[in-house]
UniProtKB/Swiss-Prot annotation:
The gene is trpF. Keywords: Amino-acid biosynthesis, Aromatic amino acid biosynthesis, Isomerase, Tryptophan biosynthesis. InterPro entries: Aldolase_TIM, PRAI_dom, RibuloseP-bd_barrel, TrpF_fam. This is N-(5'-phosphoribosyl)anthranilate isomerase. The keyword Endoplasmic reticulum does not apply. CDD domains: PRAI. GO terms for biological process: L-tryptophan biosynthetic process. The lineage of its organism: Bacteria, Pseudomonadati, Chlamydiota, Chlamydiia, Chlamydiales. It is an enzyme of class 5 (isomerase). Pfam families: PRAI.
Length: 208
């Protein structure tokens, strides 16, 4: 069971996530996100987790291919998350350069908004509640993932419901952002991160 702590905005939070057992730490570069980070901050986050066992992931949406390559090169990021318009074209151009997380938006009723292109299991598909950063889950009981084994569940996961999510859907991983933040605070909470990671990995080990 893999866990990705996304929307990290501070190097200290990244270090705490790594120490808690996060497999991935995500940094958002989308300018319309309240968790958007600068290249300078992202570089500090990458440095903070260099020896902590977590892999840094750059989260991109409406960026051009050139921008994605430039930002990743400047910050030391080798894994990227793609979403938004022209995702399939960007995926086809970048799949040989980076480890890729491919986002599929899911409607509230549990129906994916689009199909996925052919891809190997080295690509991680993330199913996220449409719109992103909602903090609420889509209908897990009505949801059925595509025929692609390597996938993560995102959107509305938190320490209180992650066990149910893992038991119900058996994802390969969990992607969480606001679910490990206190209300009104855009910093990650150490206690919430540890609780979510322990629960996800504990239940995941029992169901695998």
């Amino acid at each position: 069971m893999k866990v990705k702590i996304c929307g990290v905005t501070h190097p200290d939070d990244a270090w705490e996530a790594a120490k808690a057992g996060a497999d991935y730490v995500g940094m958002i570069f989308a300018k319309d996100s309240q968790r958007c980070v600068t290249k300078e901050t992202a570089k500090c986050i990458v440095e903070a987790i260099r020896d902590g066992g977590s892999e840094p992931v750059g989260v991109f949406s409406e960026h051009s291919i050139g921008e994605i390559i430039a930002i990743s090169s400047a910050t030391g990021i080798t894994s990227i998350q793609l979403s938004g318009r022209n995702i399939d074209f960007k995926f086809s151009q970048l799949r040989e350069l980076f480890s890729i997380f491919y986002v599929v938006s899911v409607y509230s009723n549990g129906q994916p908004s689009a199909a996925i292109p052919p891809m190997s299991n080295t690509v991680t598909v993330i199913y996220d509640h449409i719109g992103g950063e909602r903090g609420t889950p889509f209908d897990w009981r009505a949801f059925s993932p595509f025929q692609h084994d390597n996938w993560m569940l995102g959107g509305g996961v938190n320490p209180g419901n992650v066990g149910e999510a893992v038991r119900l859907l058996s994802p390969r991983g969990i992607d969480v952002s606001s679910g490990v933040e206190r209300p009104g605070v855009l910093r990650k909470d150490v206690t919430l991160m540890q609780a979510l990671i322990d629960s996800a990995k504990g239940v995941g080990n029992l169901t695998s």
